[in-house]
Amino acid sequence: MAEKIVTGDEVIVIRGKDRGARGRVRQNLPREDRVIVEGVNIVKKHQRAIPGVRQAGIIEMEAPIHVSKVMLICPHCGKPTRVGFRFTETGEKVRYCKKCQQVIEKPALHRRTK
């Protein structure tokens, strides 16, 4: 299945305790249908000490959130939107905004080099 939301996309949370929060996708977990978004779904983790390496304590970290709870923000119209797919004249499959019909390029963080 094609990824509608990829690493580097700007998204808004539409459900849950962080509803309305915006952030960039730091990591995409496609097998679990989850994403990690900067500044969203902050949890506290109790860490054990490892002698000589790290100190014990409580750290705050971003936990994964289900991909159905976030919506892509279109870089062209600036609104939360659903994502569609279509083929260009060259036969390349691209994402597009369902509101303004503009092609949404994949962020530089996600682009693969061959």
Swiss-Prot record:
PROSITE patterns: RIBOSOMAL_L24. One of its GO terms (molecular function) is structural constituent of ribosome. This is Large ribosomal subunit protein uL24. Belongs to the universal ribosomal protein uL24 family. Keywords: Ribonucleoprotein, Ribosomal protein, RNA-binding, rRNA-binding. It comes from Thermomicrobium roseum (strain ATCC 27502 / DSM 5159 / P-2). InterPro entries: KOW, Rib_uL2_dom2, Ribosomal_uL24, Ribosomal_uL24_CS, Ribosomal_uL24_KOW, Translation_prot_SH3-like_sf. The lineage of its organism: Bacteria, Pseudomonadati, Thermomicrobiota, Thermomicrobia, Thermomicrobiales. One of two assembly initiator proteins, it binds directly to the 5'-end of the 23S rRNA, where it nucleates assembly of the 50S subunit. One of the proteins that surrounds the polypeptide exit tunnel on the outside of the subunit. Signal peptide: none annotated. Part of the 50S ribosomal subunit. GO terms for cellular component: ribonucleoprotein complex; ribosome. One of its GO terms (biological process) is translation.
